[in-house]
């Protein structure tokens, strides 16, 4: 392994404020890199492709906390619901309801972040701030017993400054 996973992980962790947890984005990285990070204490990993996540989840240690970090189609929720710990990009009430439905089938509660669209790029997903306020005000989400809204996720536009 040419890449120094342990060394780089220690550099990042050294600069994090107390109480901040690192989600190591592991998509496209081989299991040996994830295992090296795991051996150094990293326990939260983020993936954005359901099939790659499923393969890694099957072979890596079972105490890893898996976060789904990309856009998630409703028809893919059923594949990750048995083991996912958090879905970081919920962009609609429809998706929230599907997560609840699939989590209930496995007698689980799945943590989620509501994704807000604040970027200039049209390619980004998310609720508008007004749509998010409306979703929360309408209160239908309160009846969803198998999801827990933990906060918001936003992706800013990539700029020079």
Describe these PLM feature segments.
Residues 1-161:
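Conserved alpha/beta-domain cores
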């Amino acid at each position: 392994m040419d890449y120094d996973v342990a060394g780089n992980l220690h550099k990042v962790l050294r600069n994090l404020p107390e109480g901040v947890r690192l989600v190591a984005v592991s998509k496209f990285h081989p299991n040996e890199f994830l295992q090296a990070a795991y051996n150094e204490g990293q326990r939260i990993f983020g993936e954005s492709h359901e099939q790659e996540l499923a393969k890694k989840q099957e072979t890596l240690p079972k105490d890893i906390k898996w976060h789904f970090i990309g856009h998630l189609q409703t028809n893919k929720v059923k594949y990750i619901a048995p083991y996912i710990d958090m879905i970081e990009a919920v962009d609609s009430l429809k998706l929230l309801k599907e997560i609840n439905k699939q989590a209930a089938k496995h007698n689980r509660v799945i943590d989620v972040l509501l994704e807000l669209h604040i970027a200039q790029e049209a390619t980004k997903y998310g609720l508008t701030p007004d749509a998010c306020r409306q979703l929360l005000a309408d209160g239908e989400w309160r009846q969803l017993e198998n999801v827990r809204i933990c906060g918001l996720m936003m992706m800013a536009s990539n700029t020079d400054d």
